[in-house]
Amino acid sequence: MKIIIIDTACANLASLKFCLDRLGFNATISRDLKELESADKLFLPGVGTAKEAMKNLEQFNLIDFIQNTKKPLLGICLGMQILGNFSEELNQETLKLIDFTTQKFKAKEGFTFPHMGWNEVYSSHALFKGLEGAYFYFVHSYCVGLGKYTIADCEYSQKFSASVMKDNFYGVQFHPERSSEAGEILISNFIKDIG
């Protein structure tokens, strides 16, 4: 099985590759279109701003490929957020693959932002098989509200989507590569059981 991490020039590429390699999945980091087209599974990581991520994808001529791929793709953190229509972060249009808008967390007394740390995630979807009541590691200031495409939810000052899915596109707001055993199980589920 060919597993490719789409090279978005963001900071967490190496840690995701290390996690995949440690699990025995030989992953490649690439932005080469021919190589990406040969993938069985794709990962779209992201750290930073939606504007920066979209600029990089445009610069690397990856937007059309991502929008048209039929291969299972997992967006991670910002990679999930840019699967939507629009991010309120610097008012940025995104990939328009799943119908949602990324919004800033609502301020609430007793909560600090960015949301950083371990939170329980609730889901009965196959992506979360064996992960009932599992905790995952989050680092984000913007979130996706609950909606039609939510497959897992979480709460921190408000309820939000911990994971979304439409067709072959999946997204997780947390960092599975930094979420210990729970993250490893989720990555294995995506590679072995999805698509």
UniProtKB/Swiss-Prot annotation:
UniProt-listed GO biological process terms: L-histidine biosynthetic process
Localization annotation: Cytoplasm
Cystine residue pairs: none
EC number: 4.3.2.10, 3.5.1.2
Keywords per UniProt: Amino-acid biosynthesis, Cytoplasm, Glutamine amidotransferase, Histidine biosynthesis, Hydrolase, Lyase
Matching PROSITE patterns: GATASE_TYPE_1
One Pfam short name: GATase
Reactions catalysed: 5-[(5-phospho-1-deoxy-D-ribulos-1-ylimino)methylamino]-1-(5-phospho-beta-D-ribosyl)imidazole-4-carboxamide + L-glutamine = D-erythro-1-(imidazol-4-yl)glycerol 3-phosphate + 5-amino-1-(5-phospho-beta-D-ribosyl)imidazole-4-carboxamide + L-glutamate + H(+); L-glutamine + H2O = L-glutamate + NH4(+)
Annotated Gene Ontology cellular component terms: cytoplasm
Major localization class: cytoplasm
Pathway: Amino-acid biosynthesis; L-histidine biosynthesis; L-histidine from 5-phospho-alpha-D-ribose 1-diphosphate: step 5/9
Glutamine amidotransferase type-1 domain ranges (all copies): 2-195
GO molecular function, one term: imidazoleglycerol-phosphate synthase activity
Highest taxon above the source species: Bacteria
Active site per the UniProt annotation: C77, H175, E177
Function per UniProt: IGPS catalyzes the conversion of PRFAR and glutamine to IGP, AICAR and glutamate. The HisH subunit provides the glutamine amidotransferase activity that produces the ammonia necessary to HisF for the synthesis of IGP and AICAR.
Assembly and binders: Heterodimer of HisH and HisF.
Protein name (database record): Imidazole glycerol phosphate synthase subunit HisH 2
